[in-house]
Amino acid sequence: DLSGADMRGASFKHANLMKAALDGSDMRDARFVKAKLSLSNMQGAKMDGTDLRGIRGRYAIWRDANWWDAKMDDSLRKALGKKWPKP
């Protein structure tokens, strides 16, 4: 359970964080390149500058997380834009 954790600038490259509770966490400038985030809860997470390129996370909960301020693949950006639109 990493709910509310301060993960600023941390590296989670290739980490398996499936079903992880990351809600309310501070992920600013963290690196999640090719991490597995499917079915994770990232509700309300701060993602300014977070590197999400190559992740698996389409089926995670992104509600109230500012995913649009993160670096990510275009395919993920398109999928998230449909399900979790920017307010």
Briefly describe each language-model feature range.
Residues 1-87:
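Tandem repeat scaffolds
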